[in-house]
Amino acid sequence: MACVFVMALAIVFLAPGIWKAYERSSLAIAAANIRQLSAGGAQYLAENNYRYWKFRENGATSIDAGGNPVVGTRYWFGYESNGSASAGEGHRSFDASQGPLAGYVPKGIHPDPSFATHASAFKPKFKCGYLGIGYNVVLGGGWSPGPKTKTMSYWQLSDPGKVVVFTTCAQVNNFQSPASTSHPMLEEFYGIDQNEKTVHFRAGKVAMVGFADGSASFLPMDESTRDNRIKGVDIGRFAPVGSFKYLK
């Protein structure tokens, strides 16, 4: 299965000045990714009655490289076969050309190098790179919408300029090997909602966001939501757990 996103840079020990350069390049890459995703998302809405795409579709069918039918999951960022899902963390793969935004988003989406700075504390999910961007699951019908689930319409939003569609994203994992309760690890993640702590405030303690009106900005963390399981990793939420602020 093709991987559109190239592998991230190898993890090496670098001087503080070079880590700063990594941070700057991460900011530029996140900005470019969110800008392109936002533009592609706007085109998708215009051609689909202004209704948002699903976060995921279970039991989605596809054709593999050999022309054989396969079953898997179509996430907002690409398609993963059931065979890939059973390959184990860090060995999974997905095909971005079969995601709902394929054809709307240019192929210049790049992996975010900031994950490499966390060295042994980072656990990759896929072998084909680290997008580092999450989609608003509230817009996309929930984490696992059914075939008849309706996603939100753009016209349902009370103030599109204050509704986040995309943001820098990651989570702390302590339940999938090699992570554990005694060794929590940072991993790439792909969605935000009203309950989970999955916003990654990696741009100088703020998160980069793309709003529903097409604008982009930065938002700070609500400190009451900070995930303290990994020192120096800024994971949390924009608003208290249970709040739909910035979500609809």
Where does each model-flagged region fall?
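Short, well-structured segments within or immediately adjacent to enzyme catalytic domains
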Residues: 30-248
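Amphipathic alpha-helical segments typified by the pilin-like N-terminal helix
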Residues: 1-32
